[in-house]
């Protein structure tokens, strides 16, 4: 499981996917999120701007990202 360490209080979902290298651009992030391919804490998330906080887990195409403070 990859970890992203927060610099601020939160990171937005689209930014987290890009930071982890799971998508190449914001446009790609928007597409995969709106198509329901991304899970946050086990539930499908459709908002690219969803704020992720310490302890949240993002799942996408078999990869998981843990958000850490």
Annotate each language-model stretch with its function.
Residues 1-11:
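A detector for short, charged/polar N-terminal pre-domain segments
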Residues 23-25, 58-61:
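Short, low-complexity, polar/charged sequence segments that are solvent-exposed and flexible
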Residues 9-51:
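A basic, amphipathic helix-loop patch mediating RNA/tRNA/ribosome contacts
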Residues 62-67:
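Short, charged beta-turn/beta-strand-edge "cap" motif at the junction between a beta-strand
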């Amino acid at each position: 499981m990859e970890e992203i360490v927060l610099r601020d209080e939160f990171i937005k979902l689209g930014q987290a996917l890009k930071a982890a290298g799971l998508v190449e651009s914001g446009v790609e992030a928007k597409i995969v999120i709106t198509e329901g391919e991304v899970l946050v804490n086990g539930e499908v998330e459709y908002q690219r701007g969803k704020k992720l906080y310490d302890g949240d887990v993002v799942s996408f195409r078999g990869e998981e990202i843990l958000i850490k403070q």
